[in-house]
Structure formats: structure tokens, C-alpha cells
Amino acid sequence: VNDAPALRAASIGVALGSGTEVAKEASDLVLLNNSFSIIVAAIEEGRRVIDNLRKIVVYLLSTSGSEIIVVGGALMIGLPLPLLPAQILWTNILSEGFMNFSFAFEPKESDLMRRDPRVVGAKQLVSRRLMGFVVTVGLLSGLLLLALYWYLVTLLGLQESDAQTLMFTALNLTMVFSVFSFKDLRAPIWKTRFFTNPYLFASIGFSFFGLLVAFMVEPITKILRLAPFDPMSHLGLLAGIILTNIALVEVAKFLFFPRKGGV
């Protein structure tokens, strides 16, 4: 189309690379190879990018929300700080940060091109449904970790440093293992394609490496104020927290996205 007024009036004006300069300046999209088939591939890639951007935002807000709940909740009920600022910073950089990075490389989902078109902007990127999911997951995960901290301090009678060390470990592990639930918000974790994103497993490896460094490199251990820790003595408790957290995320997914559909 070389009709400049029509291109300006269209929702998305498309001009050919061989068209006039006036038409190309008036259009939103210029097909350099003069082939309309590239439009489908461009739409598919655009939808994949938006999908992955949503996953990054949802994962970041959900995990950050759980940290706010556990720290704020502990202070409200009169417990000592469950996590120190340095521990939270370490977790956000080495666990949360790497996970967010890996979501950018998620492949497209199977129903991507079967979804209805929708306008996407700053306000539409995270819908009310997604925000409801974020708040629910952040609240449930935060309350789970808060209950763990209350159990460690009140019932087990652990020293503050020992309880904080266990909370630091639990927070990192729940963030790492729950990432698989965020790979596909429209499908349960048992239907998720686990091995489609090698960057995700690289991020998990970096996160575990960061956790080992925190405990094994003495200067960092002192900065984070971590107590001597034997993971085997708390293996059952940590496994239970990880599995319960995944179950809570899956329940929230079922409530907000009960079947394949738009997000």
C-alpha cells in the first residue's frame, strides 16, 4: 500500500520495502523483504517477548512480596528479624536475579498463536488477574515462611542466628524450586516442559553456587552473619517447605488460570 493517508489511519500501517518513501514514513511497519509472511513470525516473536516479560514481572513481584510478608509479619508479632538486610540482598541478586534473567529465554508456549489479539501497553502488561495472582502467591509464600520462622524460634527454641540461617536457606531454596511453576502459568507443573530452557538450569546452578559460597567462604559468611549449618539435619523440614510452597503456587495458578486462556 502506497496510500500515505490510509497508512496513517490504519491501526497498524504496513508498507513494502520497495514502496515510496512517503508511504514508509507514514507506516508503522516496513517489510524490507516485501513478504507478508514475515508478519506472522514477527507477531509470534512479539507475543513470546510479552509472555516472558510477564513471567519476569510476576516472579519478581511474587518473591519480593513474600519477603515483605515474612519480615513485616515477624516484626508485627514481636519476633526478631527473620532475615538480615545483607541476606536479603544476597538472595535477591543471586537467586531472584538469575531466575529473572533466565525467563527472557523461555521458548514460546504451545497455544501462543491461538490466543485472541489484545492491546498491550504499560497498563495492560500485568492484568488484574495477574496482579491478583501475584498478591496471592506473595501472601501465601510469605505466611508459609513466617510460620516456619515462628516454629523455629518459638517451638524449637533456636538461637536468633541459627533461625536466621535456616530462614536464609529456606528462602533461597523456595525461590529456586518454585521457578518451574512460573514457566507456564496456564498449565500445572506436572505438564510443564522442564528442559526447554538451558539458561534456566544455568541460573539454578549459579544460585546453588551462590548459596554454597555464602556458607563456605568465611569472609562472606561473616558479612551475612550465617551460623554453622548442617543441611542434612534439617533436610526433611526444608523439603517440606519447598514442596508446600510449590503446592501453594499451583493452587493459586488453578484459581486464577484454571485452563488455557488469556493472561
In which residue ranges do the predicted regions lie?
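Active-site-proximal beta-strands of protease catalytic cores
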Residues: V14
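Hydrophobic residues in alpha-helical membrane-spanning segments
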Residues: P5, A86, P219-I220
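Acidic, divalent-metal-coordinating active-site segment for phosphoryl/phosphodiester hydrolysis
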Residues: V1-A10
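Membrane-embedded transport module
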Residues: A10, S18-R186
